[in-house]
A protein has these predicted regions:
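Bacterial replisome coupling helices
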Residues: 62-161
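Non-catalytic protein-protein interaction segments used by genome-maintenance enzymes to assemble
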Residues: 1-69, 89-95, 119-122, 153-158
């Protein structure tokens, strides 16, 4: 099975869309603040990350951290097979500015990503309600209530983390 971090043939020349600022900062903080990697892995659902390159780089960062907690950027760049991913990861850490309280900023970003994901899903549920059967209505309304309740709580470790 081919790796999914290589663009399909014919798309290799097309530039990758830049991630939005929230996901770019997620990537930056994930790669710079290695002390927060375990916390991030326990609290971030990669499904909340919409940019495929950011999601893949963070996923690879987590995998590398499990294998070698002392691994840094050179090792990460060594396992990223896409040049576009390598450029994005390098760009995220390149400016070298000191970031005040990176752990707090990372928590704020993960909370924001979670809430954006929930808002997007709530909008999807609202659209689905129109044509739903009675059985689907019950499930959708229950999911909507569960998501709304989740937004009232602070970030907690994900199930299984």
């Amino acid at each position: 099975e081919p790796e999914h971090d290589e663009p399909p043939p014919g798309e290799a020349e097309q530039p990758m869309a830049k991630p939005g600022p929230v996901e770019f900062w997620l990537l930056k903080l994930a790669l710079i603040d290695r002390d927060s990697t375990s916390w991030l892995e326990a609290h971030l659902d990669l499904g909340w990350v919409t940019h495929p390159a950011v999601r893949k780089i963070v996923q690879q960062h987590f995998s590398l951290h499990v294998e070698n907690p002392d691994a840094g950027m050179p090792e990460l760049l060594g396992i990223l097979s896409s040049d576009a991913f390598k450029r994005l990861a390098t760009e995220a850490v390149a400016d070298g500015r000191t970031i005040p309280d990176p752990a707090k900023q990372l928590k704020d970003i993960v909370l924001r990503l979670r809430n954006q994901f929930i808002e997007h899903r709530l909008a999807g549920i609202q659209r689905e309600l129109a044509g739903a059967t009675e059985e689907q209505l019950i499930k959708l309304i229950a999911e909507r209530a569960q998501l709304k309740e989740l937004t009232r709580h602070p970030l907690e470790p994900l199930a299984g983390a």
